[in-house]
Amino acid sequence: SVVGEPFTQWVVEDRFLAGRPDWHAVGVEFVGDVEPYERMKLRLLNGAHSTLAYLGYLAGHPTIAAAANDDRLRAVARGVMAESAATLDGPAGVDLERYRESLIARFRNAALPHTTAQVAMDGSQKLPQRLLAPLRARLAAGREVRLLSLAVAGWMRFAMGKDERDRQSHDIAVAVRPHLDSIARRFDASVKVAEIPPGPPV
C-alpha cells in the first residue's frame, strides 16, 4: 500500500509559449504571478513547520506530528502563522485563515514521518525567509513579534545542541555549526553560541 495525504497545493505561473497544458484535472492552479504564493508558503507553511521542529525537538517530541498534537505547541504554531499572515498581501481568492488551519491538520498527520531533528537540521540557512522576514516586517510596522521571537529563540537554543532536558546531541551541534559559520561569513562576524546559566530570569 502507498501512504498519501489529503493536503495538496500545486501552483504554476501561467506563462506558456505553446499553449497551456491541461493540468486542471490533477489539481494545478494556474496564476498570473506565483510570488505571492511563494511568500505565503515560506512564511506560513515553512515558518510554522520550522517552529514546530525547533520547539518540538526541545520539548522532546520526535516527530512534527507529535509536536503539532501538543496543545501548547500547536497554539504557538497558530500564533506564529497569525503574526506572519498579517505581513502578507494574500493571493487573490485565498482564505488565509482556512489555509492556516489546513496546514495545522497536515502537521498533525501521524502518517507523515518527518522528525523534528531532520526538519530543524537544515533550517539555519532558511530562517531569514521563513521567520526573520515576517519578524522584520512586523517590527517595521510597530507590531509585536512575541511568537515569532519565540520561534527564533527556539532555533538559537537548538543550535546549542541540547534539548530542554539538557540532553546534549553532539551530532546536532556538529551539523549546525557549518551553517552558523556560513551565516557569520556573510556578515563578516564570528559566531559563538553561549549557554545561558541556569537560574531565574533577570
Protein language model features and the residues they cover:
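Substrate/ligand-engaging "lid" and interaction regions
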Residues: 1-202
